[in-house]
Amino acid sequence: MANCSTLVTENSVYNNLLQDKQTTTTNGKYSEVPGFPKIFTFSVGKPLWNKLRYHILVMENLGPDLHQLFHQRKKHFSIKTILMLASQFLTRIEFLHKEGYIHRDIKPANFLMGIGKNKHVVYLADFGLAKRNKEIYNERTKFEGTAHYASLNTHLGISQSRRDDMESIGYVLMEFLSGSQPWDKRNKKTKKRL
């Protein structure tokens, strides 16, 4: 189950990011922005017996994420598939960056395939760690994201910006091309140095 504060952040990003781009249809659902899940509702419930509030974010049903697909295919995608994925990754992240946000958790599990007529559309999801891009340089920033795909600057504690999302996309594509990351095959001593 997702951390409640990340669901609040995710809902806020969806609202701000897609506010002018989604329109309500006659059945009350939002029309989609290509490559971003439709959000149907977000709700904060009353405190439960443990005095914690529950948060609910309801979005459209999507297909498998790229982490699942990559492993189902024995860690092999064709070059053509990787190029098509790269094109859609860059389109999604360009939209996100133009809207003034950075994702901060780019990884295969946060890219999902559509279903039905959208089965070839890659969706970018999980905005629980996203934030407004302020381009403020800081060397004492708390680590946010997934270590395996995080940029070098993120590991060094430098505040994240658009470049870090792009570097993470590069690591994802490198893994799709070779089946692993370069640091997957190194010993613990070398990994620590990296």
Name every feature range the model reports, one short phrase each.
Residues 97-115:
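Catalytic-loop of the protein kinase fold
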Residues 1-16:
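ATP-binding glycine-rich loop module of kinase domains
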Residues 138-154:
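Conserved activation segment of eukaryotic-like protein kinases, specifically the C-terminal portion
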Residues 123-126:
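Pre-DFG segment of protein kinase catalytic domains
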Residues 29-78:
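Conserved structural core of kinase catalytic domains
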Residues 85-86:
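Activation segment signature within eukaryotic-like protein kinase domains
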Residues 154-194:
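Conserved C-lobe activation region of Hanks-type protein kinase-like domains
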